[in-house]
């Protein structure tokens, strides 16, 4: 991402990232703050594993089981986990689309990506961000619970938290109008 911004030599960007991509944006903004005007972080999680008082959403055993299931039956895992991630049972087509996306991915790459994602711990990086940020969090998210959004907001110096009236980890797909409204309201205040 930094190489692209450097090559295009654009003015400071407004970065929008969802889930893992949100944390990639956080790391990029730490590395090259002059390249970013604002960060919009949709359902970010600096750590998915519970740790002491920190509630990331999963125990270590649950993550180990999830990764083991991926290793043993990637396609079955994809079909099972997609509705959990989407959290929109009234719109099964969204879960089907997500499962289909998983199934089109190279399983070896997807497993490596999942392992890196679920085992990473970027909590200490949050305090290093100097870029103003909007944190969008779903009211009910099985992947990154509400407490994660609160944690991210508390540890980003210049951040605003908006809790969306939504369930699931993909509000950009399930309630895009809420995401767009929150982004517009935030950016209008700049």
Language model region names:
Residues 13, 17-19, 138:
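Conserved alpha/beta-hydrolase "nucleophile elbow" surrounding the catalytic nucleophile
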């Amino acid at each position: 991402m930094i190489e692209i911004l450097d090559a295009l030599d654009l003015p400071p960007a407004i970065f929008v990232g969802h889930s893992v991509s949100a944390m990639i944006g956080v790391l990029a903004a730490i590395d090259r703050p002059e390249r970013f005007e604002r960060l919009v972080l949709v359902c970010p999680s600096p750590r998915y594993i519970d740790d002491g008082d920190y509630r990331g959403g999963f125990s270590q055993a649950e993550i180990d089981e999830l990764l083991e299931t991926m290793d043993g039956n990637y396609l079955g895992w994809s079909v099972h986990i997609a509705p959990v991630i989407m959290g929109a049972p009234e719109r099964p087509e969204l879960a089907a689309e997500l499962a289909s996306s998983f199934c089109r991915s190279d399983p070896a790459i997807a497993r490596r990506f999942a392992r890196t994602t679920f085992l990473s711990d970027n909590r200490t990086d949050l305090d290093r961000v100097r870029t103003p940020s909007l944190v969008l969090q779903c009211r009910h998210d099985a992947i990154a619970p509400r407490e994660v959004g609160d944690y991210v907001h508390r540890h980003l110096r210049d951040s605003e938290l908006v809790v969306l009236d939504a369930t699931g980890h993909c509000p950009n797909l399930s309630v895009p109008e809420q995401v767009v409204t929150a982004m517009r309201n935030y950016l209008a205040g700049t």
